[in-house]
């Protein structure tokens, strides 16, 4: 406050004359705004105080207070007639005044932001809630009357607004206690009237003096002998009036007794609860009992900060502390007399100016009262004649205002936005448009039960005599309930058939609702998959109990159990938020929505998908509902009709997508409506469990209204539950009318309340009923029309309240406009009640009016994308879009591009184009759809995106304005350029921004500016591509572009790149003459140029240098300018195309020699690091993976020597980094490198970042489309982010499904027949396995003994282990292949030794040492660790020891983690022989010198360079081509490798890392040398194959391996004559000179490398998965893959879990595959580019490019058959395609044709004809 003003804040003792309920509602609404955080704290603290005080009341008083969650919940309760009237009135007045004050002052903090308070003028220095506020001692004073003084005291004790929130709650406590105490004392003086009539305890008398009134009262009290306690007395007085107080009957008697009083002007005051200001009644002990109670949490020593005037003396209270102040106030309230004249005088005295500088007086109050008007008059009288202003401020006005969009204080304070919806409803309402049309036309969807549900001829009996038959034939049913796109949702036909149709349609409608909402998981924080949950209501299991139970299959549980309905949605979309399936009977759907809202308010999710599900098939439910008298026998739900006789059943599926409002607005969503409140309660007091209860329904309405702070009169539409039952309609009409259209206050004529009930149209959808009602309400909001009610067939039900019309409420009997009032929002309520007693209510309001930002749209080209998972769907989606555009030609192209790219989930079948107008798009779509070869030309993209290489151009592409549009449009790109530019300027170089902005003069730039501009642009472009979601696999730089490439690869920093380029340019300018040398681009290879020039005398002696070998046909040469011109003339004369390059210097020639030394010196100061991504080097013509080759000398050479771009590309191809599918992005001002790449690899997709004379945004847009069609998923959200507010999400036609009917009909009459069955079945208990029992044998790998038998000479042992146990799992993950943990055979070795020693000691207890020879090891199926956390992965080991043969057999089996059932066949077997170690020692002693000799030979050959010596890192890097070992497994310190022979120095890690017999990592370390030989030697074809071991003949250790000990291993592998694909060898383990162990005849098999991914699949991604074939797995035997399963330490192969195939009875179509890529080069893309098709160079035969032909040729080649033999009826079994060949074929299809299929497809499509038909549709 300005120090030149004086301020008084006056707290009244009366409520304002406003609608108190509305005032509290508005306070509550503001408290949910984070800008009013302190108001919220105060209300929460006050609520807690009241709850605490109520809890301490005696039971009779406590029962008078209903449960409440906030003070708003008490506003509707009338306490005036009860003993708590004073307490509630006092505390609520305190809360109201302090709440208004806190909110008012909070606004002062917002003044700079909020300019909407035109009726108030504030001057404040508030900056935050914690700053010193403007109620300054000495300048501000507080005053009040009665209870108002308590509110003022809270302010007086506060030094900040935050203090008021805390002390204010204590003032509320004192107010409540004071009221309770006063009422209790007063009722002892006079009993309240029994009829509840309120009598006043105080009257005001005017035009009499205090003395005159006192005389009359004294006389009355004397004459009537009134006891002291009940006497009538004066409680307040001023010059013009006197307040008389006493028991009501005594006051009445006093006025009758005294003629003076009887004829005086007097009025009763609204004081109904007792006496205050009565010194004769209260004592200090009374005051102490209220103020100084032990429960009070007043801080006793809190100082009084502001003066508070006494209402008795008009002077400030003298108290210094809080406790003193409240005692003074309590004394005054209970015993003091109010003297208003003193209060006025005190205020005037405070305002009396002490200085001429005081320019204004300010009085803040809560509305104007008689008392306040008197104060104003007195102050104005004092001001008369003075140049001072009296400012009156009302602290109430602000509460009725809105201050811009609400900013929720917390999730719980947020409004919620419904942003998407979808449905399948009766009457053919398979989408929202059809549903609305049905409603608008007033259609009734009633029909009889369709035959596909059940046969009415047998299951319908209107007499009710037939047991289990229905008595009504009617219902409302959705069309084609079995139709489903199984392939889209990755389900096999078998699984789809077994899955409940309502769960299938939940998937479908969830997708459609998400599509409508524009949800792309992960696009925004609120749509991150971990923050999305699903909530669906379901109340029946018809499909599981009836249809699917006729033949229970594998998918019976996941297909039918309710939880899987939600779980499948979460799993498919990879949502990891909560998944709830709710059953609240008829209200399940809306209860699920309410649960979703609760989760959003609780912050458990950020996006929720909710809905209700019901598909009727089971006649049992018809019978049960009919027998319980729920169902109408006459037809449809007749809501509010006189003849209403029950409901009519209905199907229904509905889904909605909900977010918090602020998230929806931030995400640029279309908001269909806003949820203000949602609640569910129960009719606990109903007369029966199924009977509705009006009281419970009304309580629920109040809860929702209070939650939202909404006046029920403002609600203008209610969608009733409306079932059409006599009880239900009567009760709901009563509850709705009483709350929303009460008798008083009445609705105004313009406040009509309309009612509707969708069940009249589509029946009662049971669990889906609530969601259908909600969808209708949302459509009413969208269409601004309330559809006609068709439920009254005769006359209105007489049980409906008769006065509804007088209350201005009624059904909309015809289509009724429901316009949105200007500047206001419409409110609607949706009801849904459950037959079990539950009541759910939602309160909705209009979406915020969205003002679309009108930008200057200068993007001349837009990308339009469509995708699908099958060709039919893609074609249908294109047709739908074309039809939409034909109907809506005004559609914004920008909005369409935004919607189809940034706001869509994308699939594998893709269409994309870049267009500049809608008509152009229509033309492209028609062209594609008219193409008869559309199906064959459309190619799906691969599941695995192709690699992307960035190619950085040189300075030859420079021009002014390069990237200008990107710089202007994209803040991220602009920021990157500006940051790099600032670095350049700090290094002393000129700014490049004018070049990019094109604000520089169009004159030749200096080399420094040219080169810096190019490098900075390229680094910024590379980062921009990363922002757009492009993952870079490698980089290559051409000349100057190599600096940018090295920076992007992390070899040098961006700063160093700029520094080196700038200094290099400076050196060139200083030491090289411009124009003395030139560069010539020649369209010919180097050798031809040389020959042609040598043949001509004029040029034979010219010295030139080759600067660049760009392609095999493009060469750049350099030299002296004159000589280069001579060469040009000579070559052009020979018709060779030549171009003089527009560069001032001839780089990569002798001209730059003068700068090389200094350049290298500068570069030596720069740190070089290993590249983070491979660098393709045009200097070295290789791919660089490490830092060894990259140094200062490299940059020197790169400046001087030839840029061999062509050789670099060829090297990258040879090294497997580049193939025909690799995508190239030219990063630079103009696509020079892109052209070079296309010349080298004609089929290569190459695109540009910028292009001369083309808008760079358009260039990027086209390139993004090309990337998209190639299988890359760009981050479209970032592309549209700069202008997202300018775009609107369009509601386009929904996805067109490729549906097939998966329906299992109910056959027979067994639901009727079971009524006559008299026998039952005994349930069986499933087998279970417990792994927590004590076990005599427990190690890291052997966890529990499950069976043990020990006899005299034999013993048998069964153990069980869990591969997911941490120790076991860590052992497995020490040996990973293709990112999967695979059990190495050293694990089986340790388990064998563990069990062998245990059993042997059981039979021979006193044995000192047990020496075992592990023989005949055969691992049939590898074991791969499950990726599922928390899963159980058990395996069983069975061992049998026979002492008579000194041997033990072992077998390992997989077991089912749920049932404990052990597999029939083992996955590994072995033998242990208990032998004499002396025999081993003798055997090995004879061999030791031979082994040591071979080791010495290897050492010698290594020293001579004839054998390779590998360091530890290099050895395991070679190993990593197949297997990645953890550190503990990496025991080989060095290796000498000579073709198939090798030796290794080994040091075991000292740690055992667990409990073992022999740690697996030690076994592996001494023995996996054999695997390295086969997988790392030059003698092996490691490019096409990898090598694994299926077993060995023996494994022996003379003594136990020792921690930290050093060993040597030696092996020589050789081909086995019986199998050319198999190698074998012995691994010797030496310690010192002695052989201490041996792996005898380890066998290693060669396996095609293309099967690596098949056997070792990487972890699944979080994106929406691609389609899969119908089988979840297939059986692959070890021998079927040429015995390639693993044994000892070499890599091992997994086995796919068997899953027998059962053909579907209803559908046999296999689902679509993961798609393959179709791309074209950028140059072939027209300005309005249609769908991109395969480049001609990619096709094997330009004449025959049919995919079927390619597939047949591939199959013929791989099987060795002629193509002619592959006839349509030929079966794969007859053709010899076994499981191994199917694996190979599926990999070949992927690798060569880009077709992703599972090998199980050869089982699903057993003939050539079926296979080709499938390929034709999906490939």
From Swiss-Prot:
Cofactor dependence is on: pantetheine 4'-phosphate
Pathway of action: Secondary metabolite biosynthesis
Relay the cofactor remark from the entry: Binds 1 phosphopantetheine covalently.
* Keyword presence, Acyltransferase: yes
Q: Which residues form the Carrier domain?
A: 1742-1819
Point out residues bearing the modification O-(pantetheine 4'-phosphoryl)serine.
Answer: 1779
Keyword annotations? Acyltransferase, Multifunctional enzyme, Phosphopantetheine, Phosphoprotein, Transferase
Among InterPro entries, the record links this protein to: Ac_transferase_dom_sf, ACP-like_sf, Acyl_transferase_dom, Acyl_Trfase/lysoPLipase, Ketoacyl_synth_AS, Ketoacyl_synth_C, Ketoacyl_synth_N, PKS_Beta-ketoAc_synthase_dom
EC number(s) per entry = 2.3.1.-
Query: What protein is this chain from?
Result: Non-reducing polyketide synthase nscA
């Amino acid at each position: 406050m300005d120090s030149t003003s004086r301020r008084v804040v006056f707290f009244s003792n009366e409520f304002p004359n406003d609608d108190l309920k509305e005032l509290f509602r508005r306070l509550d609404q503001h408290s949910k705004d984070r800008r009013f955080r302190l108001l919220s704290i105060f209300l929460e603290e006050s609520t807690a105080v009241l709850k605490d005080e109520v809890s301490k009341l005696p039971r009779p008083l406590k029962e008078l207070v209903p449960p409440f969650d906030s003070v708003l919940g008490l506003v509707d309760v009338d306490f005036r007639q009860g003993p708590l009237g004073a307490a509630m009135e006092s505390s609520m007045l305190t809360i109201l005044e302090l709440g208004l004050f806190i909110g008012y002052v909070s606004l002062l903090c917002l003044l700079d932001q909020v300019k909407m308070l035109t009726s108030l003028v504030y001057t404040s220095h508030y900056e935050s809630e914690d700053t010193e506020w403007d109620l300054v001692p000495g300048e501000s004073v507080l005053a009040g009357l009665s209870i108002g003084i308590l509110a003022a005291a809270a302010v007086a004790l506060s030094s900040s607004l935050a203090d008021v929130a805390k002390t204010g709650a204590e003032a509320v406590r004192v107010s409540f206690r004071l009221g309770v105490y006063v009422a209790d004392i007063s009722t002892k003086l006079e009993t309240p009237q029994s009829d509840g009539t309120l009598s006043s305890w105080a009257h005001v008398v005017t035009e009499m003096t205090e003395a005159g009134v006192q005389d009359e009262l004294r006389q009355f009290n004397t004459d009537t002998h009134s006891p002291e306690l009940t006497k009538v007395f004066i409680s307040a007085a001023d010059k013009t009036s006197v307040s008389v107080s006493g028991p009501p009957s005594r006051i009445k008697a006093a006025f009758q007794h005294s003629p003076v009083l009887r004829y005086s002007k007097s009025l009763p005051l609204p004081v109904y609860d007792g006496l205050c200001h009565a010194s004769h009644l209260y004592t200090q002990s009374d005051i102490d009992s209220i103020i100084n109670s032990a429960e009070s949490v007043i801080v006793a020593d809190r100082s009084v900060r502001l003066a508070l005037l006494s209402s008795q003396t008009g002077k400030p209270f003298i108290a210094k502390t809080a406790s003193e102040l409240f005692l003074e106030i309590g004394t005054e309230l209970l015993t003091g007399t109010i003297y208003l004249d003193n209060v006025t005088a005190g205020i005037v005295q405070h305002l009396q100016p002490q200085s001429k500088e005081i320019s204004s007086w300010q009085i803040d109050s809560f509305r104007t009262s008689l008392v306040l008007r008197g104060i104003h008059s007195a102050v104005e009288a004092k001001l008369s004649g003075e140049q001072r202003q009296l400012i009156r401020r009302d602290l109430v006005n602000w509460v009725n205002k809105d201050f811009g969009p609400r900013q929720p204080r917390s999730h719980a304070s947020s409004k919620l936005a419904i942003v998407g919806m979808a449905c399948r409803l009766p009457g053919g309402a398979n989408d929202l448009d059809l549903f609305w049309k049905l409603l608008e036309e007033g259609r009734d969807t009633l029909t009889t039960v369709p035959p596909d549900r059940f046969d009415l001829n047998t299951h319908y009996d209107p007499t009710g005599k037939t047991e289990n038959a229905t008595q009504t034939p009617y219902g409302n049913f959705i069309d084609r309930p079995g139709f489903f796109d199984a392939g889209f949702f990755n389900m096999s036909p078998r699984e789809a058939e077994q899955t409940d149709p309502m769960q299938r349609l939940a998937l479908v409608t969830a997708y459609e609702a998400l599509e409508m909402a524009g949800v792309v998981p992960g696009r925004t924080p609120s749509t991150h998959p971990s923050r999305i949950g699903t909530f669906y209501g379901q109340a029946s299991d018809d499909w599981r109990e009836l249809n699917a139970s006729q033949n229970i299959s594998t998918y019976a549980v996941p297909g039918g159990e309710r939880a899987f309905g939600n779980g499948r949605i979460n799993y498919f979309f990879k949502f990891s938020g909560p998944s709830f399936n709710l059953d609240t009977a008829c209200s399940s759907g809306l209860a699920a929505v309410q649960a979703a809202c609760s989760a959003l308010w609780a912050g458990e999710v950020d996006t929720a998908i909710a809905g209700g599900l019901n598909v009727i098939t089971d006649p049992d439910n018809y019978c049960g509902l009919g027998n319980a008298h729920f169902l109408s026998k006459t037809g449809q739900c007749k809501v509010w009709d006189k003849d209403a006789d029950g409901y009519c059943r209905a199907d229904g599926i509905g889904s909605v997508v909900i977010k918090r409002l602020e998230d929806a607005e931030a995400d640029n969503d279309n908001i269909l409506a806003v949820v203000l409140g949602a609640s569910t309660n129960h009719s606990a007091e109903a007369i029966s469990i199924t009977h509705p209860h009006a009281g419970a329904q009304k309580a629920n309405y109040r809860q929702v209204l209070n939650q939202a702070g909404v006046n029920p009169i403002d609600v203008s539409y209610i969608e009733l539950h409306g079932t059409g039952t006599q009880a239900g309609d009567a009760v709901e009409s009563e509850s709705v009318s009483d709350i929303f259209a009460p008798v008083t206050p009445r609705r105004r004529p313009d406040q009509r309340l309309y009612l509707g009930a969708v069940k009249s149209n589509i029946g009662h959808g049971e669990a889906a009923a609530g969601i259908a009602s909600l969808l209708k309400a949302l459509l009413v909001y969208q269409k601004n029309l309330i559809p006609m009610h068709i439920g009254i067939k005769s006359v209105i039900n007489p049980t409906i309240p008769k006065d509804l019309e007088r209350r201005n409420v009624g059904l909309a009997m015809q289509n009724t406009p429901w316009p949105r009032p200007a500047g206001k929002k419409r409110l609607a309520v949706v009801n849904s009640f459950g037959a079990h007693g539950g009541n759910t209510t939602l309160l909705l309001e209009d979406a915020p009016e969205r003002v679309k930002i009108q930008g200057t749209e200068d993007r001349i080209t837009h990308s339009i994308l469509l995708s699908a998972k099958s060709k039919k769907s893609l074609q249908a989606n294109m047709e739908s879009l074309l039809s939409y555009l034909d109907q809506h030609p005004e559609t914004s192209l920008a909005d369409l591009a935004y919607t189809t790219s940034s706001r869509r989930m994308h699939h594998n079948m893709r269409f994309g184009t870049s267009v500049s107008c809608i008509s152009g798009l229509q033309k492209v779509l028609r062209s594609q759809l008219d193409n008869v070869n559309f199906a064959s030309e459309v190619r799906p993209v691969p599941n695995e995106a192709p690699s992307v290489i960035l190619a950085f151009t040189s300075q030859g592409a420079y021009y002014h304005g390069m990237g200008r549009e990107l710089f202007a449009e994209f803040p991220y790109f602009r920021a990157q350029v500006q940051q790099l530019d600032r670095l350049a300027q700090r290094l002393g170089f000129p700014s490049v921004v004018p070049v990019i902005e094109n604000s520089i003069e169009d004159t030749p730039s200096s080399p420094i500016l040219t080169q810096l501009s190019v490098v900075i642009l390229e680094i910024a472009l590379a980062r921009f591509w990363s922002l757009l979601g492009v993952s870079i696999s490698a980089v290559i730089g051409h000349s100057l572009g190599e600096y940018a490439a090295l920076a992007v690869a992390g070899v040098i920093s961006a700063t160093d790149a700029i520094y080196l380029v700038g200094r290099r340019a400076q050196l060139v300018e200083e030491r090289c003459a411009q124009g003395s040398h030139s560069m010539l681009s020649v369209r010919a290879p180097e050798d031809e140029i040389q020959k042609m020039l040598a043949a001509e005398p004029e040029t034979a002696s010219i010295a030139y240098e080759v600067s660049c070998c760009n392609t095999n046909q493009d060469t750049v040469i350099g030299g002296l300018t004159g000589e280069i011109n001579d060469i040009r003339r000579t070559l052009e004369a020979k018709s060779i195309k030549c171009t003089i390059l527009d560069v001032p210097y001839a780089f990569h020639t002798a001209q730059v020699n003068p700068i090389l030394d200094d350049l290298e010196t500068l570069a030596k100061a720069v740190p070089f690091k290993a590249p983070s991504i491979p660098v393709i080097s045009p200097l070295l013509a290789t791919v660089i993976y490490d830092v060894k080759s990259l140094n200062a000398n490299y940059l020197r050479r790169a400046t001087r020597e030839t840029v061999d771009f062509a050789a670099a590309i060829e090297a990258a191809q040879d090294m497997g980094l580049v193939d025909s599918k690799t995508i190239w992005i030219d990063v630079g001002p103009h696509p020079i490198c892109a052209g070079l790449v296309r010349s080298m690899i004609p089929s290569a997709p190459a695109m540009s970042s910028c292009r001369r004379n083309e808008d760079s945004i358009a260039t990027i847009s086209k390139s993004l489309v090309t990337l998209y069609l190639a299988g890359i998923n760009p981050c479209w959200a970032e592309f549209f982010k700069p202008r997202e507010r300018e775009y609107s999400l369009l509601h386009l036609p929904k996805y067109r499904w490729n549906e097939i009917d998966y329906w299992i009909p109910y056959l027979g009459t067994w639901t009727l027949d079971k009524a006559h069955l008299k026998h039952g079945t005994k349930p069986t208990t499933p087998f279970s396995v417990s792994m927590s029992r004590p076990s005599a044998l427990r190690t890291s790998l052997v966890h529990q003994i499950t069976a043990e038998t020990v006899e005299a000479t034999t013993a048998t042992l069964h153990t069980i282990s869990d591969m997911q146990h941490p120790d076991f799992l860590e052992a497995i993950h020490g040996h990973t292949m293709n990112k999967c943990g695979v059990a190495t055979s050293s694990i089986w070795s340790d388990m064998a030794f563990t069990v062998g020693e245990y059993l042997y000691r059981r039979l021979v207890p006193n044995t000192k040492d047990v020496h075992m020879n592990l023989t005949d090891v055969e691992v049939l199926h590898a074991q791969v660790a499950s990726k599922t956390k928390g899963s159980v992965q058990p395996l069983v080991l069975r061992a049998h020891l026979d002492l008579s043969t000194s041997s033990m057999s072992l077998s390992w089996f997989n077991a089912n983690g749920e049932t404990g059932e052990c597999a029939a066949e083992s996955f590994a077997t072995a033998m242990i022989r208990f032998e004499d170690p002396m025999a081993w020692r003798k055997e090995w002693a004879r061999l030791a010198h031979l082994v040591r000799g071979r080791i010495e030979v290897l050492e010698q050959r290594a020293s001579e360079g004839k054998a390779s010596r590998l360091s530890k890192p290099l050895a395991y890097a070679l190993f990593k081509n197949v297997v990645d070992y953890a550190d503990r497994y990496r025991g080989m310190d060095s290796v000498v490798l000579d073709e198939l022979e090798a030796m290794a120095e080994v040091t075991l890690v000292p740690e055992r890392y667990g409990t073992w017999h022999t740690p697996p990592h030690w076994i592996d370390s001494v023995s996996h040398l054999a695997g390295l030989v086969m997988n790392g030697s030059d003698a092996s074809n490691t490019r096409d194959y990898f090598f694994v071991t299926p077993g060995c003949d023996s494994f022996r250790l003379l003594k136990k391996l020792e921690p930290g000990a050093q060993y040597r291993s030696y092996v020589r592998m050789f081909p086995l004559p019986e199998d050319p694909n198999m190698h074998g060898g012995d691994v010797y383990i030496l310690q010192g000179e002695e052989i201490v162990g041996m792996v005898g005849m380890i066998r290693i098999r060669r396996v095609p490398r293309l099967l690596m991914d098949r056997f070792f699949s990487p972890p699944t991604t979080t994106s929406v998965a691609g389609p899969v074939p119908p089988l979840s797995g297939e059986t692959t035997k070890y021998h079927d893959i040429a015995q390639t399963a693993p044994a000892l330490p070499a890599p091992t192969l997994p086995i796919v879990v068997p899953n027998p195939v059962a053909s579907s009875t209803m559908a046999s179509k296999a689902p679509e595959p993961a798609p393959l890529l179709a791309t074209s080069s950028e140059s072939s893309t027209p300005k309005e580019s249609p769908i991109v098709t395969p480049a001609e160079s990619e096709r094997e035969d330009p004449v025959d490019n049919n995919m079927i032909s390619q597939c047949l040729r591939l199959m013929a080649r791989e099987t060795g058959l002629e193509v002619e033999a592959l006839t349509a009826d030929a079966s794969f079994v007859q053709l010899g395609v076994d499981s191994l060949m199917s694996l190979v074929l599926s990999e070949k299809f992927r690798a060569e044709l880009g077709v992703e299929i599972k090998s199980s497809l050869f089982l699903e499509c057993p003939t050539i004809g079926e296979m080709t038909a499938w390929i034709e549709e999906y490939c």
